[in-house]
Amino acid sequence: MARATPIERYRNIGISAHIDAGKTTTTERILFYTGVNHKIGEVHDGAATMDWMEQEQERGITITSAATTCFWSGMGKQFQPHRVNIIDTPGHVDFTIEVERSMRVLDGAVMVYCAVGGVQPQSETVWRQANKYKVPRIAFINKMDRTGANFLRAVEQIKTRLKGHAVPLQLPIGAEENFKGVIDLVKMKAINWNEADQGVTFEYEDIPAELLPEAQKWHQHLVESAAEASEDLMEKYLGGEEFTELELKAALRDLALRNEIVLVTCGSAFKNKGVQAMLDAVIEYLPSPTDVPAIAGQLEDGTPAERHPTDDEPFSALAFKIATDPFVGNLTFFRCYSGVVNSGDFVLNSVKDKRERVGRIVQMHANKREEIKEVRAGDIAAAIGLKDVTTGDTLCVESAPIILERMEFPEPVISVAVEPKTKADQEKMGLALGRLAQEDPSFRVWTDEESSQTIIAGMGELHLEIIVDRMRREFKVEANVGKPQVAYRETVRNEVKDIQGKHAKQSGGRGQYGHVVIDLFPLEEGAGYTFTNDIKGGVIPGEFIPGVDKGIREQLKSGPLAGYPVVDVGVRLHFGSYHDVDSSELAFKIAASMAFKSGFMQAKPVLLEPVMKVEVETPEDYMGDVIGDLNRRRGIIEGMEDGPSGKLVRALVPLAEMFGYATDLRSATQGRASYSMEFGKYAETPNNIAQAVIEARQSK
């Protein structure tokens, strides 16, 4: 089968925004204008097409990143049909992992901001992730029809808060209830959308006289920015020559693809204005798969390699999301980077070294699906029938194996114990949690060995609430949930040398003998654990050394101080002794764990706690109460600035003090303040609190 759309006309984009910036409505309008949806779904009715999980419709927030395919030929039908694959990304900080996952497989992004709220805290997290993966982006300032809408303030915030070189491509005509349309600063024309047909048709008109001076000023700004694209253009600009429309667009595209500028569009998705022109900007200024660098990976022997976006290269793809579908089981969403895959083909999961058969292949439109026979380089689709694929795995042809760059997922910061309400649900709960953990790599499940409780851990309270909720809805498992527990860690502050560990047992027959001498020392934050073997002259034979490392690693899982995982500790093995007959790997394992325990307690052990970055936006009247409350929670106020609806307070607060904060903040500010929270760092727990935590653990 030949390729239906040339790869140069593909756009793989993500639509990303803070909660409530109107991202889902924007996506809905895109689906409407591209002709996929004939009735516009509104978020407030709970009918939006992209938000297809029940909870999303109830909460009005987007949780699952759904991938949708649509076609666009321009609002004036001025382009050849372009294939646009949209990955809808959640805006809530507990779902940052979803955003990270989708950024990994995108070529470009549309950042949606609210014209009233501007750049909100969560927007910065998403921006950082887009920077990490070098994703070119354009901005869409939405909700221009809302009271307090201010386009230029939002543009300014992209510069100051996100350090993005924002260049307006349009200006709004009017604002709030007088928002009429936009000025196209390239064409220097006003665009007026027809309200009778929900903005499907439009007219170019002259710019209103009162807005002309402002439009000319910003047109000049656009031209100056474009001149930076090359020396030839700069010469032309300095020589006073005009740029043609084609030259201007080519220069702006070039700069946008190099991530040197962020072009800014505006509109009101709800009022059917602006989304159409923003789609044109996606086609004109965001990359096709051939405009971004080839994907890097490594071959089986570790040699670096890359795959180019052509159908002629061997097939390679990255699985970026697993979703459980009530009708077909597991759906594996994947981005095909090179080659072609057909339904029925056998592929290799090179990360797990397992051969899998691709059953059916579907292309998703939100929650409707179309079955297709093949997927070519540059496309995004979902496969049914892959059994053992998790997020971040590479799929490729067996004859040319490659492992594409892995994704990195953060460690969870909060855990709760869950138990099924009835014994009959025990097995179902295990199955459900296993399924959910496969879908979401930032969610972990394990059994606490001491209490035999099932523990689930994730990125925040909302994250775990939604997991429990999904267990109830999708798997019909009712569960009791314990109090949230903080994921403390243990480490040491001092170095201790020459710690002896000796395990000798003589009880008739063959005995056990292992003897080690180690140094134990702190490492810098985030270094984890290192083991150095400095044994000279064979005082411990080589075959027993792995046993020493194993013995210490086992101790790291449950530290000597309070049974929490140990981090950032180094061990150097430099002396010991052995017995010709009685020594074994097991004996050295026991000796090493004895030495580690004793050394750890001498090396000034401390408890570390997760500290969260908290941002509270509050009306000024409640400022004192909010700051006082954060101080009471052991918070360190990092800064304050003016926010769109009051003051923005940034603080670092220990997670242990943040439980139930949403309710307390609501009652302290009569529901007028909002906050967002994300993991910041691990820091030493104050002595009195550490003592209480340790005693509570020991009394269990």
From Swiss-Prot:
Subcellular location per UniProt equals:
Cytoplasm
- Superkingdom assignment: Bacteria
Task: List, in alphabetical order, the GO biological process terms annotated in this UniProt record.
Answer: ribosome disassembly
What GO molecular function annotation could you give as one example from this UniProt entry?
Answer: GTP binding
Supply the InterPro entries for this chain: EFG_II, EFG_III, EFG_III/V, EFG_IV, EFG_V, EFG_V-like, EFTu-like_2, G_TR_CS
Q: Where does GTP bind?
A: 17-24, 88-92, 142-145
- GO CC annotations? cytoplasm
Q: Which residues cross the membrane?
A: none
The record's annotation in PROSITE patterns points to: G_TR_1 (PS00301), G_TR_2 (PS51722)
Which positions fall inside the tr-type G domain?
8-290
Q: Does this entry carry the keyword Zinc-finger? A: no
Broad class of where this protein is predominantly found: cytoplasm
Q: One Pfam family for this entry, by name?
A: EFG_III
Under PANTHER family, the record lists: RIBOSOME-RELEASING FACTOR 2, MITOCHONDRIAL, TRANSLATION ELONGATION FACTOR G-RELATED
| Family classification | Belongs to the TRAFAC class translation factor GTPase superfamily. Classic translation factor GTPase family. EF-G/EF-2 subfamily.
Question: What the protein does?
Answer: Catalyzes the GTP-dependent ribosomal translocation step during translation elongation. During this step, the ribosome changes from the pre-translocational (PRE) to the post-translocational (POST) state as the newly formed A-site-bound peptidyl-tRNA and P-site-bound deacylated tRNA move to the P and E sites, respectively. Catalyzes the coordinated movement of the two tRNA molecules, the mRNA and conformational changes in the ribosome.
Q: What NCBIfam families does the record point to? A: EF-G (TIGR00484), PRK12740.1-5 (NF009381), small_GTP (TIGR00231)
Q: What is this protein called?
A: Elongation factor G
The root-end lineage is: Bacteria, Pseudomonadati, Pseudomonadota, Gammaproteobacteria, Aeromonadales
